[in-house]
Amino acid sequence: MERAAPSRRVPLPLLLLGGLALLAAGVDADVLLEACCADGHRMATHQKDCSLPYATESKECRMVQEQCCHSQLEELHCATGISLANEQDRCATPHGDNASLEATFVKRCCHCCLLGRAAQAQGQSCEYSLMVGYQCGQVFQACCVKSQETGDLDVGGLQETDKIIEVEEEQEDPYLNDRCRGGGPCKQQCRDTGDEVVCSCFVGYQLLSDGVSCEDVNECITGSHSCRLGESCINTVGSFRCQRDSSCGTGYELTEDNSCKDIDECESGIHNCLPDFICQNTLGSFRCRPKLQCKSGFIQDALGNCIDINECLSISAPCPIGHTCINTEGSYTCQKNVPNCGRGYHLNEEGTRCVDVDECAPPAEPCGKGHRCVNSPGSFRCECKTGYYFDGISRMCVDVNECQRYPGRLCGHKCENTLGSYLCSCSVGFRLSVDGRSCEDINECSSSPCSQECANVYGSYQCYCRRGYQLSDVDGVTCEDIDECALPTGGHICSYRCINIPGSFQCSCPSSGYRLAPNGRNCQDIDECVTGIHNCSINETCFNIQGGFRCLAFECPENYRRSAATLQQEKTDTVRCIKSCRPNDVTCVFDPVHTISHTVISLPTFREFTRPEEIIFLRAITPPHPASQANIIFDITEGNLRDSFDIIKRYMDGMTVGVVRQVRPIVGPFHAVLKLEMNYVVGGVVSHRNVVNVHIFVSEYWF
């Protein structure tokens, strides 16, 4: 039975003891279980050890203290595991990878948190479906949600890339808000449905009207007991027991432990054996065994007298066949019978009866060739053998050609006539069945005729090969390796280089700057700047490019200073310089160039073009076409080798955007610096100019 409990917050230690509080009821009313639980929490928090002795004489209080201490320790260890996953991104505990209880809980929560972070990184849902347990599922969901981030990158007053950085939002851990955590407000069992907390009771208890407490069910009154007929039901706390209320029956007596014990009538002297008999006890009764033993051929009657046994009646077939049994005092004799036989019969070997003479038995041939002798009681007759018929003209038995007389009805495949019979045979790929007429398919695959896989078909078999192999055109049974790298699609199997191996293939990547992706086919760029394997000096900035890295040092020109937004960053793809004129420097003040930025972009080799490739976005800080607003003009002033790039103006999300596009293929390795200008023109005069130097590195590979 379940009822919804009042939706109210209860201190966590009391939730953990919803079931344990029942143990104390009626045992020691002076013991305050809440205080015992608080002691257990303090021991876990300060001592980190639940095995220390508890200063109490109450068994129930010690049980509560131990359970609350272990519960608090589990929460502390789980919080440590979540911190390891978020801060170190690995689950190596300070105590090493041991099998202690602390390390087990720390590692479990750490692994569950890493799974949640990995699910978010792979774009999967944070609503977990793995059967990993309730606590692990809550940690999984919390870490998955917390690892989402948002953000954006500005280049001066522009936004020169379309990268998005997500700002982490603080979310409350749903596991900490579980109202059934530790037992909830319920005294025995608790279930949080989301809308409310539902309490229920153990077997043998029922829920009270307060929806929280439980009371014992009297099964003896409600009739829910299982006592059998002849037993009385006695109620106990949470259950019941059955007690026998009738006697055990004749020959048994009831013991103190409600069981039946055999009565030894011989020892107690309550038997009725006569003086010439000895009493022998049995289970539930007794037996009277006579003292006098009779000789062979005699049996004792009820009074102990020896009387003769008639073996001719009591024994089944006491004499051999052909003999008659005659009873004697204490024994019997057998007398032989001598019968007289007529014509066509003779006495059997035992001489007991007459049997038929088989005139047809070899080597006698009373009927001659082509005929069959048929014996009959006291005589015989001659007829044609099976497979022959009697020719009235020649007066002889002639062979029957069954194959011609019954075409297609005798054999499954082929029929061959023989003298007096016929033989059936089968085509290739079949064998004769047990009936000698039907043909059944031969499973040629049982003899392994193929080099790899074999499929039995009706009357034959077919060889086929495993993945990565093909059947030989020469013998049709040998499997030859398929060179996947030489197939028309082989160039697209691997992103760099394909290596054929027996039954499969392997992909490889350039010797440096790349590693093979988990799918075993694509090559992934190694970010040397992130992994720390670059050799850039302290005055240089490491920029990752496809297949390598570059160490670059950008200095602001005279009358310009480094932007504070990029000055404090340890790693960025953009360096921005803002104009900072000295006092009374009129030339500097009237110079329209306000910002000079350097940014780095890495591109693969585009060997074929179907449409221009958009690579850089310059976003203006003012909305398009406001009243009395400057006209924004984008231009490439330097570094556009062979006009491989162009820039167009576009309006996106209410902003004016300059889009740099690659319009011609470039085969790497290639390095160029594009100088981009964004001019604010008012009345035909440039009032404001931002300069962006884009360092373009083109890889020699297309990936």
Swiss-Prot record:
Q: Name one Pfam family in it.
A: ANATO
Tissue localization of expression: Isoform A and isoform B are only expressed in placenta. Isoform C and isoform D are expressed in a variety of tissues and cultured cells.
Q: What is the effect of changing residue 397 to F?
A: Found in a family with syndactyly, undescended testes, delayed motor milestones, intellectual disability and signs of brain atrophy; uncertain significance
Q: Where is this region: Self-association and FN1-binding?
A: 356-440
Q: Where is the signal peptide?
A: 1-29
Q: What cellular-component terms does GO give this entry?
A: basement membrane; collagen-containing extracellular matrix; elastic fiber; extracellular exosome; extracellular matrix; extracellular region; extracellular space
Query: Start and end of every Anaphylatoxin-like domain?
Result: 36-76, 77-111, 112-144
Query: Which Gene3D superfamilies does this UniProt record tie to the protein?
Result: Laminin
What keywords are assigned to this protein?
Calcium, Chromosomal rearrangement, Disulfide bond, EGF-like domain, Extracellular matrix, Glycoprotein, Host-virus interaction, Repeat, Secreted, Signal
Please tell me whether the keyword Isomerase is annotated for this protein.
no
Disease linked to the protein? A chromosomal aberration involving FBLN1 is found in a complex type of synpolydactyly referred to as 3/3-prime/4 synpolydactyly associated with metacarpal and metatarsal synostoses. Reciprocal translocation t(12;22)(p11.2;q13.3) with RASSF8. Fibroblasts derived from a patient with synpolydactyly displayed alterations in the level of isoform D splice variant incorporated into the ECM and secreted into the conditioned culture medium. By contrast, the expression of isoform C was not perturbed in the patients fibroblasts.
Name the family the entry cites: Belongs to the fibulin family.
The annotated subunit structure for this chain is:
Homomultimerizes and interacts with various extracellular matrix components such as FN1, LAMA1, LAMA2, NID, ACAN, CSPG2 and type IV collagen. Also interacts with APP and FGB. Interacts with FBLN7. Interacts with CCN3.
Its recorded name reads: Fibulin-1
